[in-house]
């Protein structure tokens, strides 16, 4: 079965679109956080326990895992991915299929197109889910990608002189 290649923008905010560029709304901030976290490391399998702790640090393990299952269901419905081809489940955990998404933050880091065109602002700018461990990760990624953007813009400025 084939599936639509999704477009995910994480630089400057969170925007998700289908292959035709039509916006896809997620009914839950946690679903967006789950997708952003997995998509920022395409193909990497992340354990359910790690994700549950990241997104629901104030809940017990059983309740956090139940919340993860529910959030994954919400995400898959929005993506029309009940077969699990875009967000892949395995015994080891969850992953985003790298061929299912075009992800601006990943392309920015790979230098797939002019980085200055891709960088639209801080990583997940304005995004907040009130989960301290996720927020710590988010701050780190914002700082790292912001520094990378500054290097890119500095190099462009030096080239133009």
In which residue ranges do the predicted regions lie?
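A structural micro-motif at secondary-structure boundaries
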Residues: 10-32
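Residue-level signal for inorganic ion chemistry
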Residues: 51, 75, 108
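Generic start-of-chain signal for non-secretory N-termini
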Residues: 1-7
């Amino acid at each position: 079965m084939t599936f639509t290649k999704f477009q995910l923008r994480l630089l400057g905010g969170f925007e998700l679109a289908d292959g035709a560029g039509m916006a896809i709304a997620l009914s839950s901030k946690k679903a967006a956080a789950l997708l952003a976290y997995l998509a920022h490391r395409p193909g990497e399998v992340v354990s359910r326990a790690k994700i549950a702790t990241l997104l629901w640090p104030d809940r017990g393990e059983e309740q956090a895992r139940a919340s993860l299952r529910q959030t994954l269901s919400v995400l898959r419905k929005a993506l029309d991915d009940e077969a699990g081809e875009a967000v892949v489940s395995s015994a080891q955990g969850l992953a985003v299929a790298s061929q299912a998404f075009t992800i601006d933050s990943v392309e920015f880091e790979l230098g797939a197109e002019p980085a200055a065109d891709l960088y639209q602002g801080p990583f997940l700018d304005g995004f907040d889910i009130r989960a301290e461990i996720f927020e710590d990760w988010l701050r780190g990624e914002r700082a790292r990608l912001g520094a990378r953007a500054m290097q890119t813009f500095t190099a462009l400025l030096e080239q133009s002189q």
